[in-house]
Amino acid sequence: MGSRPRGALSLLLLLLAPPSRPASGCPAPCRCSETRVDCGRRGLTWASLPAAFPPDTTELVLTDNNLTALPPGLLDTLPALRRVHLGANPWRCDCRLLPLRAWLAGRPEREFYRDLRCVAPLALRGRLLPYVAEDELRAACAPGLLCWGALVAQLALLVLGLLHALLLALLLSRLRRLRAQARARSTREFSLTAPLVAESAGGGAS
């Protein structure tokens, strides 16, 4: 008798427990805890940085790596992201950092990013990244590299726009289908109840 309440309580706690992130959702070589992704102190570079992170990531740790820049659009694909730890990286302040600087400029909590300093080029060494002007970043790149970086950023934004449009189209299609099913169900119920109502009315008149 006493074991049943304990068993019911255990089942209730299991049902109320927050779902854990599946192992496949955590990119190697990072470690994940709930919506926090820790990729710090992994020796990551531009080439070895994971191509994507779980979309529900709220905190991303990239400190103490060998990152000189981030792939364009990487942080923009994380709508729930609230904080990114970017310190202790050898940031090269050129046109490839324009997407990161734009992302930082739109963050309300700028105090977390005031320690990001440029390591290269020599003209910008020691400068705080959030306070480096866009023109200075563009000037640090060759024209060809600047055009290539802009093209990559535009392609990333285009892909994101297409994905959003596709999701919106699927949602609208689903809503139309549900509305049509509800309308058909209502028509079917009316066709079934109408003869009964007519029969009841006829019986009362006789």
Curated annotation (Swiss-Prot):
Disulfide bonds join 26-32, 30-39, 93-118, 95-141. Keywords: Blood coagulation, Cell adhesion, Disulfide bond, Hemostasis, Leucine-rich repeat, Membrane, Phosphoprotein, Signal, Transmembrane, Transmembrane helix. Residues 27-55 form the LRRNT domain. The modification Phosphoserine is found at residues 186, 191, 200. LRR repeats lie at residues 60-83. GO terms for cellular component: glycoprotein Ib-IX-V complex. Its main location: membrane. The modification Phosphothreonine is found at residue 193. Residues 27-150 are extracellular. Residues 172-206 are cytoplasmic. One of its GO terms (biological process) is blood coagulation. GO terms for molecular function: identical protein binding. InterPro entries: Cys-rich_flank_reg_C, GPIb-IX-V_Complex, LRR_dom_sf, LRRNT. The chain crosses the membrane at residues 151-171. It is a single-pass type I membrane protein. Residues 89-143 form the LRRCT domain. It is found in: Membrane. Residues 1-26 form the signal peptide. The keyword Ribonucleoprotein does not apply. Gp-Ib, a surface membrane protein of platelets, participates in the formation of platelet plugs by binding to von Willebrand factor, which is already bound to the subendothelium. Two GP-Ib beta are disulfide-linked to one GP-Ib alpha. GP-IX is complexed with the GP-Ib heterodimer via a non covalent linkage. Interacts with TRAF4. Platelet activation apparently involves disruption of the macromolecular complex of GP-Ib with the platelet glycoprotein IX (GP-IX) and dissociation of GP-Ib from the actin-binding protein. This is Platelet glycoprotein Ib beta chain. It comes from Rattus norvegicus (Rat). The lineage of its organism: Eukaryota, Metazoa, Chordata, Craniata, Vertebrata.
